[in-house]
UniProtKB/Swiss-Prot annotation:
Region annotated G1 motif, chain positions: 36-49
Full protein name: Guanine nucleotide-binding protein alpha-2 subunit
Domain of life: Eukaryota
UniProt GO molecular function: G protein-coupled receptor binding; G-protein beta/gamma-subunit complex binding; GTP binding; GTPase activity; metal ion binding
UniProt-annotated binding residues for GTP: E44, S45, G46, K47, S48, T49, D151, L176, T182, G204, N270, K271, D273, A328
GO biological process: G protein-coupled receptor signaling pathway; negative regulation of pheromone response MAPK cascade; positive regulation of conjugation with cellular fusion
Cofactor(s) of this protein: Mg(2+)
Function text: Guanine nucleotide-binding proteins (G proteins) are involved as modulators or transducers in various transmembrane signaling systems.
Binding site for Mg(2+): S48, T182
Alphabetical keyword list: GTP-binding, Hydrolase, Magnesium, Metal-binding, Nucleotide-binding, Transducer
Cross-referenced PANTHER family: GTP-BINDING PROTEIN ALPHA SUBUNIT, GUANINE NUCLEOTIDE-BINDING PROTEIN ALPHA-1 SUBUNIT
Region G4 motif, residue ranges: 266-273
Annotated stretches, region: G3 motif: 197-206
Species this chain originates from: Neurospora crassa (strain ATCC 24698 / 74-OR23-1A / CBS 708.71 / DSM 1257 / FGSC 987)
Lineage: Eukaryota, Fungi, Dikarya, Ascomycota, Pezizomycotina
Length: 355
């Protein structure tokens, strides 16, 4: 009887062992088809926008309730932009064209804690509309690169009637244009072909970078974003700093880091649309990039100049850099770009990922 009992114990133990082995094999199979993709880059480079696009393209998008939660963010973006403009007007001694707009600017200074279930507050509608039409405000906006004015103001203020409609539900494009500063780590999971992608976005401002270290283990692919339009823009956290110089410095440390010796390095020079638009009125040689010798308004040569500049900072001749010019708010362009990224990852890691 004792032996029989022991036999049952042994059988149960063997069964548990088989289950454990089965679970381990299942986990190994799952992990072999999982791509850990880390999004890095300086602040304002468009990382959060890329993450939203992945949700739109590959993960069923945003529900109506999720979209409504972005209304307070959009309102806060508009308010914050006008406050930055007001400070800049004082700094650059720019006057409002219409003196009556003084009271409208005062209204934009009033704090308002908006809930997700309420429409944008009406008392800010006329002030926003009138200020947007003021030539003094427009003059300050022209200097937006000098005081870190976010690039979504033109988009939102050209459509204020729609935003202040009582039944307004933010569109996908509204969500892509809206700006919510990333703190900590945000993860998005989506399936693409035979692979499952786990994409991590970490805060880009200097104070957030110390948190990146926790994401570095077993990264298959590093996606580094640069706002190519930031060549003439100051940093949010340092008005004397330059976004492009900050990105070059950060890229050099990342591209040559021991953490990424086995990772694929993908470089997105993002906001190429804004870059092309501003280049004729803001030549890159005016902003410290004096080793550029191409035509001042040739966006093809100027964008290649920056891509070459980033590639040259990679000190490992055997490590390939996969470079793309992107516009993170353009869903179709990003879909094509991510298709190229997918092909590269499959080709590069075929044995580890599929076999």
């Amino acid at each position: 009887m004792c032996f029989g009992g022991r036999g049952k114990d042994d059988e149960a133990e063997a069964s548990r062992s088989r289950e454990l082995d089965k679970q381990i094999r299942a986990d190994e199979k799952r992990l072999s088809k999982e791509v850990k993709l880390l999004l890095l880059g300086a602040g304002e480079s468009g990382k959060s926008t890329i993450l939203k696009q992945m949700k739109l393209i590959y993960a069923q998008g945003f529900s109506k309730n999720e979209k409504l939660e972005w209304r307070p963010v959009i309102f806060a973006n508009i308010l914050q932009s006008f406050r930055l403009i007001f400070d800049a007007m004082n700094e650059f001694n720019i006057k409002l064209e219409d003196e009556d707009n003084e009271k409208n600017m005062v209204q934009m200074m009033v704090d308002y804690e908006m809930r997700g279930d309420e429409p944008l507050p009406l008392e800010y509608f006329e002030p926003a509309k009138k200020l947007w039409q003021d030539s003094g405000v427009r003059q300050a906006i022209e200097k937006g690169n000098e005081f870190a004015l976010h690039d979504n103001l033109q988009y939102f203020c050209s459509d204020l009637d729609r935003l202040w409609d009582r039944n307004y539900v933010p569109s996908d494009q509204d969500l892509l244009r809206s700006r919510l500063r990333t703190t900590g780590i945000t993860e998005t999971v989506f399936d693409l072909g035979q692979l499952t992608y786990r994409m991590f976005d970490v805060g880009g401002q200097r104070s957030e970078r110390k948190k990146w270290i926790h994401c570095f283990e077993n990264v298959n692919c590093l996606l580094f974003l640069v706002a190519i339009s930031g060549y003439d823009q100051c940093l949010v956290e340092d008005k004397d700093g330059n976004q492009m110089n900050e990105a070059l410095m950060l890229w050099e440390s990342i591209a040559n880091s021991h953490w990424f010796t086995k990772s694929a390095l993908i470089l997105f020079l993002n906001k190429i649309d804004l870059f092309k638009e501003k280049l004729p009125r803001s030549p890159i040689t005016n902003h410290g990039f004096t080793d550029y010798h191409g035509p001042p308004d040739d966006s093809k040569q100027a964008s290649k100049y920056f891509m070459d500049k980033f590639r040259a900072l990679n000190r490992n001749p055997d490590k390939e850099i996969y470079g793309h010019f992107t516009n993170a708010t353009d869903t179709n362009l990003l879909k094509i770009t991510m298709g190229s990224v997918q092909d590269m990852i499959i080709q590069r890691n075929l044995k580890q990922l599929i076999l």
